[in-house]
UniProtKB/Swiss-Prot annotation:
Species assigned in the record: Frankia casuarinae (strain DSM 45818 / CECT 9043 / HFP020203 / CcI3)
GO cellular component terms, semicolon-separated: plasma membrane
HAMAP family assigned: UPF0060
Domain of life: Bacteria
NCBIfam families assigned to the protein according to its UniProt record, in alphabetical order: PRK02237.1
One Pfam short name: UPF0060
Keyword Transmembrane included in the entry's annotation: yes
Keyword Mitochondrion recorded: no
Name the record gives this protein: UPF0060 membrane protein Francci3_2786
């Protein structure tokens, strides 16, 4: 159950951080206004709290592993929201990052 909870928290973290950054981008770069920016800031703040819910107690490990989730999640967000089409190098890079997440977070430690 710990791994499932951790993975779900990584997904929530990705949605809050990537979504927050996207909202700020929309507010500033796409001129959608301060409400979008404010919502984005709120989502980004929520991301900071979500990370604290991870079962592992080591901040550095959590953030290092989340970096890989962020890479893959950003590509997925681009596909779903912005019509981005990743090439094979994007996909290979994301796969390598997710492998890193698995090693950092879930490898059996002795």
């Amino acid at each position: 159950m710990g791994v499932v909870r951790s993975l779900l928290l990584f997904v929530v973290a990705a949605v809050t951080e990537i979504g927050g950054a996207w909202l700020v981008w929309q507010g500033v770069r796409e001129h959608r206004g301060p409400v979008w920016v404010g919502l984005g800031i709120g989502f980004l703040a929520a991301y900071g709290f979500v990370a604290t819910l991870q079962p592992d107690a080591h901040f550095g490990r959590i953030l290092a592993a989340y970096g890989g989730v962020f890479v893959a999640g950003s590509l997925l967000w681009g596909v779903a929201v912005d019509g981005f089409r990743p090439d094979r190098y994007d996909l290979a890079g994301a796969a390598i990052c997710l492998l890193g997440v698995a090693v950092i977070m879930y490898a059996r430690r002795v």
